[in-house]
Each structure stands twice: as structure tokens, then as C-alpha cells.
Amino acid sequence: MKRLFFPLLLIIILSCQSNSINKKNPIKEEVSQKKTFLKLEKERYNVAFLIMDGTFNTELTAPFDIFQHTIFRKNIKAMNVFTVANTDQAITTFEGMRIMPDYNYLKDSLPKIDIFVVPSAEHHLNSDLEDIAMIDFVKQVDKEATYVTSHCDGAFVLAKAELLKGKVSTTFPSDINTMRKMFPELDIRKDVLFVHDGKYITSAGGAKSFEAALYLCEFLYGKEVAKSLAGGLVIDWNVDTVPHLVVK
């Protein structure tokens, strides 16, 4: 009987210790998973990119590349670039890239956003426009942002948020008629790659997202800086050769 008792007692003791350790582990895990945020440099423009499942790579990465490279130019007000989404989990782009958002706009305290970028996403012509929280967020950011830009069908989001009323805009060429039918009160132009009207810059998207981003940099920093940024990405840049419209 004693031979059975002591092994049984040992098993019970080890089991209790194991349970005690397991109870402590979730606390350690919770601490280790505490969210950390980017360090944003002062005296820079804060540039937020709105991302979600189905975001198209080029409309995100083209302006992101151009704007991020401003930190390597001297004597200018460079840009802090970061992403915002409605989740803490990775989003999956249309092409399959997985990206962890820097901020969750539903939960986190966001920095002031100076420049807001809305790349196109797969469902910007339908279900995304029914996302009330997202549309409300866009409206809220617009109140303080100095510039708001869209690429490709990102213009549909701006239109749904009622930001393009009284403004001239453009979108992905084959979706212009769709946008005109959906928002008949808007002035939507074709045969241009981007439109600058007030604080809003809307572009045709795709690879031409580079041109719209370079235009904003030229507008903010001048021709030489824009050419330098373009050269760093092996892009021939001359705004005069790009079909565009600036509304004065």
C-alpha cells in the first residue's frame, strides 16, 4: 500500500505545480503580446494608408515607396508612413501579400493624420461601401487632414464619404462610367491620370499611382526633390508629360 501511496502523492504534487505554472503563463503571454507602435519622428508629415482585405498591391506600394523615400532627402519636411485598418490581424491583399496594420482605427489612439491615402481594394465598388465604420473613419480623418488622396477605385470611398461634392475627380479608366452612374452629382473626368482639386488628389491607379505620388511630392518639395525621388526608383519624371488636371 505504501508503495502505491508515495508515487500517487508525487503525481498529485507535480500536477498541482503544472497547473500553477499554466495559470501564470497566460499573464506572461498577455504581457509579451502588448501592442507596440511605430516611433513617429516629429516635424514630419504623418501619412496614413487605409488598408483592408483585397487592397491592390500597386495602389498601396507605389505611393508608399515614394513617400517613404522622403526621409532620405535633406532640408525637407519628410514623411512618416504607416498603415491603418479595422483589425489587429494581418490583412491579405488582392495579390496575396499579408500585411500587419500599424494601427487599428477602431481601437487605437491614432496620431494626427496630415496626408491620407486610400488605395483601391477589391470590393470598393460594392460591399466596402457598406462598411459604415470605415466610411465614418474616412470622414473623420478628412476633417483634419491637409491632403486626401485616392488611387484607382479608392475614389469610390471618397465619394461615398461625400468628400468629392463640388470637386473634380477621376478613377480607374474602365470604372469611370460606373462611378458616374453611382454618383451622378459628381464631376468625374476621363483622359487624365490624376486630378488635383483643393486638398484632394485622385488618380487612375495602377502603375500611374507613382505619378500621382510624385506630383504631390513636387507640389510640396519642388521639382528637384521629385526628380530625385523618381530617380531612386528608376522612374523618368516630368509632370508636363503626364495627362493631368489641376483645378485652380
Predicted regions and their residues:
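Sec-dependent signal peptide recognition
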Residues: K2-L8
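C-terminal motif of bacterial Sec signal peptides marking the signal peptidase cleavage site
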Residues: I12-S15
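Extended, subdomain-level signal for the structured scaffold at the beginning of enzyme domains
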Residues: Q17-V148, F156-A159, N177, K190, ...
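Residues that mark the start of a beta-strand
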Residues: R44-N46, V168, K199
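A short beta-strand/loop micro-motif in the catalytic core of glycosyltransferases
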Residues: V148-T149, S169
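A conserved active-site-flanking secondary-structure segment within enzyme catalytic domains
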Residues: K165-D191
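Conserved Rossmann-fold dehydrogenase catalytic segment
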Residues: R189-A204, V234-N238
